[in-house]
Amino acid sequence: MTSPLLESRRQLRKCAFQALMSLEFGTDVETACRFAYTHDREDTDVQLPAFLIDLVSGVQAKKEELDKQITQHLKAGWTIERLTLVERNLLRLGVFEITSFDTPQLVAVNEAIELAKDFSDQKSARFINGLLSQFVTEEQ
């Protein structure tokens, strides 16, 4: 039986972020998702949630497009490569969820900020908040 905690969208976003980080170092989407979803469980023979797979495979499929969208919102002289891997992947995840899911935009922004607080620092969380908020404002 699956834990309700692992089924929450917040927890699945965390797993998606961890899977995206794994993919930076070479693996496939399903393996990365399976490890992120089951790494602290005894039973690893579970069906992966569609939301998790959709987030990770979507970000991977649209990585170039997402990077272009993010780059358009960076300050002059900054490139996507200058960002940390954590920031890059959180921004990709946030922009993808904003543009590809029915998730309310402010929820997607807040979730990315919370992940930044968990996996980086306050400065990074403020940066992600600023960039994603600017992105949302321009999308409306």
From Swiss-Prot:
GO cellular component: a single term: cytosol
Gene3D superfamilies: NusB-like
UniProt KW keywords: RNA-binding, Transcription, Transcription antitermination, Transcription regulation
GO MF, one example: RNA binding
Domain of life of the source: Bacteria
Gene Ontology BP annotations: DNA-templated transcription termination; transcription antitermination
Family: Belongs to the NusB family.
Function: Involved in transcription antitermination. Required for transcription of ribosomal RNA (rRNA) genes. Binds specifically to the boxA antiterminator sequence of the ribosomal RNA (rrn) operons.
Protein name per the record: Transcription antitermination protein NusB
Species classification: Bacteria, Bacillati, Bacillota, Bacilli, Lactobacillales
